[in-house]
């Protein structure tokens, strides 16, 4: 959203998933279930929309079990690029202390059979400069994903790679080349069974996909073949300017969801709404609930959602769904929980 806001696998499974994916692996062919859950924010705190960094505040793992008990099976885990690599964009290693905190979240999620989205929350930027467009090189971006794909997965199929949070104000054709470099790096690192979220422009807004602004990104290819593992990343907020910064909702966005669903079917693609949310108001209890129900009904074109946000957010934050003393707030109980898988 537009504010400041990894692995032991059974060796048999890892070996099976690392095998060539020519079409005879049942795990490779399996479809994702209907997904629903939350963003656990904090490891991204201090990152602004220009990719400048501040001070992270990674949450503990206790909320993972809490939300799984509620019915969640998807956790998006935002992290700042600078924090992951010790503020060195060309680093050949991950920052050990920070990554240990982040990896604990990933492990907590996948150990319970849920899905973890690894989200680099930098708005396609590093300290104000755009990836591949005057800022970090595509190789720097690819190196980051090589490190993450190597460290995070052990080829665990419950990891989903969210390449970049909310790119904006950039050349989309050039950005498609940066995205392709990251996809290639992930696959070359041996992470061949995981899904990858392709981030669109305009803060990953839904309209940019079906209105054609993101057409260049449809040309991104997967070295393992096909496009079934390349999911489209979508964000949608229902406040007056769709920014996710206001307490009141003014639409349920079902018209946008219908257009997206039709477009996805027409193009043979699938998407995840990795950010949406609402304020602690009656309008958002209604509109967010209707929107999430619409996502549920649009499965499998739209595979699911992750609501913004819990984790290290104080319960008083305008879009908070952080539980208080283990108790969910009213927005979560009314709008989110009934639409979880």
Swiss-Prot record:
Propeptide residue interval(s): 17-30
Pfam families reported in the protein's UniProt record:
Cellulase
A GO biological process of this protein is: cellulose catabolic process
Signal sequence span per UniProt?
A: 1-16
Q: Per the record, what are the reactions this protein catalyses?
A: Endohydrolysis of (1->4)-beta-D-glucosidic linkages in cellulose, lichenin and cereal beta-D-glucans
| Alphabetized GO MF terms | cellulase activity
**Entry keyword set:** Carbohydrate metabolism, Cellulose degradation, Cleavage on pair of basic residues, Glycosidase, Hydrolase, Polysaccharide degradation, Signal
What PROSITE patterns does this protein's entry cite?
GLYCOSYL_HYDROL_F5 (PS00659)
Coiled coil region boundaries: none
Annotated active site residues, numbered on this chain, are 166, 275
E.C. number(s) listed in UniProt? 3.2.1.4
What's its job?
Has endoglucanase activity on carboxymethyl-cellulose (CMC).
Entries under PANTHER family matching the protein: CBM1 DOMAIN-CONTAINING PROTEIN, ENDO-BETA-1,4-GLUCANASE A
Can you tell me which family this protein belongs to?
Answer: Belongs to the glycosyl hydrolase 5 (cellulase A) family.
Query: What is the protein named?
Result: Endoglucanase 1
Q: Which organism was this protein described from?
A: Saitozyma flava
Gene giving rise to this polypeptide: CMC1
